[in-house]
């Protein structure tokens, strides 16, 4: 999948990142932005996964700045921003690509979500693609040429609300955001687990301040 680069923003994610990475097709480019100076983490990942580049930030940048850094390194047409506590299904990327080529004018595509709490988050036909106002940031598929005017995440946000702000700015420029029920991404811990990751990042930032 040379049209897609996956960007994963991590912070002390050693215990969950391998499940995520093992679910990704080995030919797909992956950029990890690790919010620390953990050289062992970088070396271990780059040795095990030849499709992966790990950037060490040396400090906790947060969701917006970390993902923007990763996106600045992307050279492909599309990027998938993925949480480290999410895993792809075997046809996730293929389904994203099929929909992307069909729609062509979209800015963001979002998946249906499956986790232990919610096996079917949207009670609609599973083949349906429909426009939405915003998406959950645990997995968002970006059509990068649609972001030249808007930019990516506002770095004034450290944790929470970044994806909502981005979606609002996209909508203000008449950019289109879709949810595709055919695309399934498993969110391992569900929303509460994701909040724990964000809470750890927030605690770390406050501690350093």
Task: Give residue spans per PLM region.
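Glycine-rich, basic loop-to-helix element that forms the pyrophosphate-binding segment
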Residues: 56-74
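Short aromatic/hydrophobic "clamp" motif used to bind/position activated sugar donors
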Residues: 79
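A recurrent flexible, glycine/aromatic-enriched loop bordering the glycosyltransferase active site
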Residues: 125-145, 149, 164-166, 194-195
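Active-site-adjacent helix/loop segment of glycosyltransferases
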Residues: 168, 172-209
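Acidic helix N-cap motif at the loop->helix transition within catalytic regions
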Residues: 16-18, 39-47
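Conserved donor NDP-sugar-binding/catalytic core segment of glycosyltransferases
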Residues: 87-122
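A conserved acidic beta->alpha catalytic loop
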Residues: 23, 34-42, 59
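Short, well-formed alpha-helical segments that are part of the catalytic scaffolds
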Residues: 10-26
């Amino acid at each position: 999948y040379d049209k897609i680069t996956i960007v994963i923003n991590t912070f002390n994610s050693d215990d969950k990142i391998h499940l995520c990475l093992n679910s990704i097709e080995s030919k797909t480019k992956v950029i990890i932005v690790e919010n620390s100076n953990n050289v062992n983490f970088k070396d271990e990942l780059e040795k095990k996964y030849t499709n992966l580049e790990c950037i060490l930030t040396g400090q906790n940048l947060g969701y917006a700045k970390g993902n923007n850094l990763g996106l600045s390194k992307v050279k492909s047409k599309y990027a998938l921003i993925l949480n480290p506590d999410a895993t792809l299904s075997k046809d996730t990327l293929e389904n994203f690509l099929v929909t992307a080529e069909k729609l062509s004018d979209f800015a963001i595509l979002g998946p249906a979500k499956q986790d232990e709490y919610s096996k079917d988050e949207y009670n609609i036909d599973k083949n349906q693609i429909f426009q939405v106002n915003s998406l959950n940031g645990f997995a968002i598929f970006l059509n990068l040429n649609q972001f030249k005017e808007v930019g990516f995440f506002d770095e004034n946000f450290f944790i929470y609300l970044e994806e909502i702000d981005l979606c609002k700015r996209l909508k203000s420029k008449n950019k289109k955001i879709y949810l595709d029920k055919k695309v399934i991404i498993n969110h391992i811990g569900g929303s509460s687990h994701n909040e724990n990751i964000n809470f750890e990042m927030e605690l770390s930032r406050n501690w350093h301040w």
